[in-house]
Amino acid sequence: MQRKIPRRIVDGVLLLDKPSGMTSNGALQTARRLLNAAKAGHTGTLDPMASGLLPLTFGEATKFSQILLDADKTYEAGVKLGTTTDTGDADGNVVAEHPVSVTREALEEVLSRFRGEIDQLPPMYSALKRDGKPLYEYARAGIEIEREVRRVTIHDLELIAFSGEHFSMRVRCSKGTYIRTLAMDIGAALGCGAYLDALRRTAIGDFDAARAVTLEALEASPAAMRDGLLEPVDALVAHFPKVELQPAEAAAILQGRELRKPEDGQGSVRLFCGGRFLGVGEWQSGSLRPKRLIATQTGQ
C-alpha cells in the first residue's frame, strides 16, 4: 500500500490564472495538491466558463481572505446580442431569439445607464445559497426561488469592441456584481436580449492577472521551488500603513493587549517586528489594538 504523504504548512497567496472550463474548487484542490498544503482556500468563486485571476490563500493567509472578497473586481466580457439563455451564459439552453438592429451609438447610450450604482437581481444559476443549498441546484430542478434585488456599483464600464451582434466590454465593479446579469440587463435594455459568451477576470483590488501563474506553470516547477511562486501573507494587506513594533510591544500585541502609542493613527495597519509580519492591528481612541494576528512561527 502506498503511504500517504502528510500535508505540510504552507503560508502565502498564489495568484492563479484559472483556465476556462474548471471550477474554482477544482483549481484550488489541484493547486493544493501540487503544493502539498495543509490548509487552503480561495477568495471568491469564479464561474467555470470564466478564466483569469483567482487568488488562492494558504495557511495563515486564509485569515485575510475576506479582504479580497470585499475588494473591487475587474473583468473583460464578451456579450452575444439577440439570444437569451436560461443560465445567462453560453453554457445554457437558448430560450429566446430576436433580430438585432443595434448601432454603436445606441449601445454606448445603454451602457451609460449601467454606470454608477445599479440594482441587480442575482441569477438562479449562481452559488448563492438558500437553506444551505446553492441556487443553481434549485434551478437545475426547475425550481424558481425568490431573490432580493442587490445594489451594486459599476465604477467603470468601457466598450472595447462592437461588431453588430457581439460586443466586448471592460467592467470594474463592486463585490457581489454578476457580469452575467449585467450582460442580460444590457440586452434587455437594447430590446434584443443577450447572454455572456466569454468572461475573464483581470484584477482584484491591487492584484493583476498579469502577475498570475497557470496550473501548468505550477506543475512544471520543481516541487522544492513552488513555494517561490507564492506572494507573502502580508501582500493581502499591503494597502494598510505599516507599523514597526519594538520586541516588548510585539509581545504585548501577541498576548492580545493594546498599546498606547505617541502617534495617533487611524484604521487598520500592518504590524511588523524586526521585519517579520505579525498580523493586522487597528487604531482605536489613541490605542493600537490587535485585530487579526498570524501564528508567529509561520509568519512571512
Swiss-Prot record:
Keyword Disulfide bond attached: no
GO BP: mRNA pseudouridine synthesis; tRNA pseudouridine synthesis
InterPro entries from the UniProt entry: PsdUridine_synth_cat_dom_sf (IPR020103), PsdUridine_synth_N (IPR002501), PUA-like_sf (IPR015947), PUA_sf (IPR036974), tRNA_psdUridine_synth_TruB (IPR014780), tRNA_sdUridine_synth_fam1_C (IPR015240), TruB_C (IPR032819)
Keywords in alphabetical order: Isomerase, tRNA processing
Pfam families from the UniProt entry: TruB-C_2 (PF09157), TruB_C_2 (PF16198), TruB_N (PF01509)
EC nos: 5.4.99.25
Catalysed reactions, semicolon-separated: uridine(55) in tRNA = pseudouridine(55) in tRNA
Record: active site: D47 (nucleophile)
Function: Responsible for synthesis of pseudouridine from uracil-55 in the psi GC loop of transfer RNAs.
Family: Belongs to the pseudouridine synthase TruB family. Type 1 subfamily.
PANTHER family membership: PSEUDOURIDYLATE SYNTHASE TRUB1, TRNA-PSEUDOURIDINE SYNTHASE
Protein name: tRNA pseudouridine synthase B
Species the sequence originates in: Azoarcus sp. (strain BH72)
